[in-house]
Amino acid sequence: VLFSCGEKETILLPKSDSTVVKEVRDYSPIYLFFKTKGKDTLVEVNRKNAISSTNWIFHIDKRLPLRLVVPEIIKLQAKKEGSAHKSETSENYFSYSDSLHKNLAFIPFAKLKFLQGKPHKEVMLISKNDFQLTRLKKDLATTTIGFDQNLSFGTYLQYKIAIHNLHLSTISKEEFIY
């Protein structure tokens, strides 16, 4: 799925076959573009239209690795939180393409706190080649999840949607990127 903005930049959005949130009103778009320079992968952030009192929708290229995406999200979350004009009711959302229903869909993450590095407590680690929903136990008080920093954003978002669709109340609001 291609998504473009005014400067003819292209974003390949992640795909899923379900919609978590169908519509978001009063929002500012934030774009994280996939760029290459030689053999290096780079992220280019366009937040020119970000208004702190609105909901923010993050349109992130699915090819970008988490190690590049998460530091930018952390910076933007801090900027929004530190704004004198922020709204207590505004949310942050990741956008993706619902391929089954053929619409743009969203998953909220405003309450989520990203932590970099391996946790010092027991955690469900999700690596680039290993994801098993059955390992998410419903009997744990809290399940903290860690994602491999080399996962593509597209794969990460597919996992997030799958976990969301389990409707577990025990998932921590902290995620580790290791």
Describe every region a protein language model picked out.
Residues C5-Y178:
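Long, low-hydrophobicity, acidic/polar, solvent-exposed interaction domains
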